[in-house]
Amino acid sequence: MAKKNPRNTRGKIVSAAWQLFYEQGYEETTVEEIIETSQTSKGSFYHYFDGKDALLSTLSDLFDEKYEALQETMDPDMPAMNQLLYLNGELFRMIENKVSVELLARLLSTQLVTNGERHLLNQKRTYYRLLRKIITQGQERGEFSDQQSVSEMVRLYALSERALMYDWCLRGGEFSLRQYAAQVMPGFLSSFRAENRSENRIEKTD
């Protein structure tokens, strides 16, 4: 008999919960509906979560699930900057389509005041591992400057994304998060580029 994958079970619960939160609202969603939609059991739900409130801290899980799916389909030969902008665009598209402004604002505010784990900053997340991989690759290819460390560039990228999400929440979602990010993220990340190094190499070969 095949063993039940605990990660899949937990992931099903998380995905179903956020789908329902978006479609009918957090307050209107019940644990029973989450269990039914996720096709799991009451025992499984309470094995992973104390109650519905505990699911509010799982938004980073939903994000990481998206990153894992994108990683499978993204062309690794794509320029590193394009990979970063692609990830950003697809994540923000998902946020617009699956996460309410109110719940995102609630998550960001609780992360500011919590005395417990700040899930968004957990360096073991798929998010941070993928960013480190892409940025390291960008430096090795000469696409990104080596004047900043990989860790610093990862921090700046994550900071830019959080700033955009915070502003979107602050303004009540009055604009397209994805479209606005497409306009400003290239500017935010321009310091990553190794343009000066490329120019120097060209001059030396002439």
Please place each PLM-identified region on the residue numbering.
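Hydrophobic alpha-helical connector segments
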Residues: 58, 72-98, 150-157, 178, ...
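Amphipathic C-terminal alpha-helical segment
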Residues: 93-97, 133, 137, 154-175, ...
